């Protein structure tokens, strides 16, 4: 219903557990000739599907969820997925101005660009350590309990590489970032150069009483 309100015509749904031969679903999709094909799966299955779809002459744009967010997608599908769209709660490290030095240090140490969620993992660890420090202080220097650390995490406000993090009473981030991204190159080594198409800042849903 919401798609219709946005002027989007959903031409059909196809489901499969196939991982190698997608002809049974590619044929009817090609006949309908949609503007866009959304694949709700993960990169290894999607890569084979997208590659076969292009080989069968399908010209539609491709899109998928955060299960696409892996350089292995281009390693498997190559040029077939260049220009496709995917959504993720994590953008490439290049979209975060404060993460520039982190990216440089990461590449210097590991000889490659940071993988998806690397900057988020850094922020998570740093926030956790800050919360543990606060829990230690609140416990008078004694070893805090798991519950005390959990409470401290929810109270911690942290200015991270990726965003400013603050939690609500449920433990959810008060605001979450959501990205629409586009694959920039068929080269897996350039996955970190994927383009940010749109960024959404979404508030956490209210606590139901």
What are these regions (language model features)?
Residues 1-209:
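Extracytosolic ligand-binding ectodomains
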């Amino acid at each position: 219903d919401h798609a219709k309100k946005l002027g989007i015509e959903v031409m059909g749904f196809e489901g499969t557990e196939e991982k190698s031969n997608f002809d049974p679903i590619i044929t009817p999709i090609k006949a309908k000739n949609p503007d866009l094909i959304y694949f709700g799966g993960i990169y290894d299955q999607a890569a084979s599907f997208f590659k076969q779809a292009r080989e069968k002459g399908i010209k539609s744009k491709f899109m998928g969820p955060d299960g696409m967010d892996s350089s292995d997608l281009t390693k498997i599908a190559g040029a077939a997925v260049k220009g496709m769209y995917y959504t993720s709660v994590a953008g490439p490290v290049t979209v975060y101005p404060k993460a520039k030095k982190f990216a440089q240090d990461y590449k210097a140490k590991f000889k490659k660009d940071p993988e998806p969620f690397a900057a988020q993992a850094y922020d998570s660890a740093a926030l956790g350590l800050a919360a543990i420090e606060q829990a230690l202080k609140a416990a008078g220097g004694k070893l805090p309990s798991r519950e005390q650390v959990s409470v401290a995490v929810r109270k911690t406000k942290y200015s991270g590489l990726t965003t400013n993090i603050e939690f609500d009473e449920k433990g959810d981030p008060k605001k979450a970032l959501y990205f629409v991204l586009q694959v920039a190159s068929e080269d897996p080594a350039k996955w970190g150069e994927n383009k940010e198409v749109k960024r959404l800042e979404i508030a956490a849903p209210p606590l139901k009483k």
